[in-house]
Amino acid sequence: MSNWYTADTHFGSDSKEVLVRDNRPFKDINEYTKEQVRIWNEHASSDDTIYVIGDFCNCFPKLENDFRSGLAVSKQINAHIILIIGNNEQRAIDVYFDGSFEKFREYCLNDPSCKFDDVKLNDYVDIKGEKFFLTHKPTDHAKDCQTLFGHTHRYGGLWKPFGFNVGVDLNHFRLFSDDDIMFMLGQKKKYWDEDMAINS
């Protein structure tokens, strides 16, 4: 039983703009979705858990099918999925669920089109004895431990003094493993923080 991490997948039938904006190397959203499902199912077994740290789906007002088709991609994934809501899920909550996180969560957990094990605003995980805070926006990072986040896609880079961006664009569209996170933490402590101090 392993844990995996990603963010900013932006699944949904009308999500072509994300492919264009982020230069994702896929001809269309169908090819992108099919490849992501293949990668996730290749990496994560049915006993594993994938933490999606926001923006699993795309949501724009007046495109209700977009976020619903995006959430439905969860049915194609073999592993357990825990969704930390991002700004796109929050938009869906505000527009389609009367601003109620609980209604959105209930939809994700109980609607036959979805397969999520839980939906949370944020969470903590323990990775090999190190505590990490999971939240979508890096501006909401924890003060008492490292944070795994998304939201900035590739534009904010892989790491910050307070944690790591696990966005799909930063790992060749693959999931980050516990070992990946611990490797980055080791590099950060040994080199990256030192480099930052030298170059500031």
Predicted regions: what they are:
Residues 1-4:
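Extreme N-terminal starter segment of soluble prokaryotic enzymes
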Residues 6, 11-121:
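Core catalytic region of metal-dependent phosphoesterases/phosphodiesterases
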